[in-house]
Amino acid sequence: WLVPERAGPGPSDGSSLVWLYHSHVHAPKDSNAGLIGAMIITAKGKTRPDGSPTDVDREFVTLFNIYNENQSWYFDINMKTYLRATNRVDTNDLFFIESNMKHTINGYLFANMPLMTMKQGERVRWYLLGMGSETDLHTAHWHGNTVLFHGHRTDVVELLPASMKVADMLADNPGT
């Protein structure tokens, strides 16, 4: 798979950037079923043999998204598998609809995502993705550490639907 140079970092970018892939075949059903992800493009000549950028020690990819299980390919299958009396469920009930809206980071709910650990002094690159609809307004927030984002130091990066952002961190505050 060849990536044209124009898809990679430009003169004002770091050594790598992120693109968001999602299906346009049966959207939003495909995206709500998980057919979504990141493509990281690193500038030619700035990669290690494994493809990672030479100017960072660790990379993290985070996708902030509200998955709408009501609009997933798996909705009917899950209803039949996990509910005994599907005919008693009002799928138009607002509480039922909201109960199937899954607020996630990388598809994980309720703080059950594996820890993203780093060592003090490591140069960490964060690839931040936001996807969804007008309700998907997210903020990536780091407690005790900051990132460099577009030349500015911050501890919060806003993510709107269909946004792709890269932030660099020097992990300097252990234990947070």
Placement of each model-derived feature along the sequence:
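Copper-binding active sites and cupredoxin-like electron-transfer domains
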Residues: 1-176
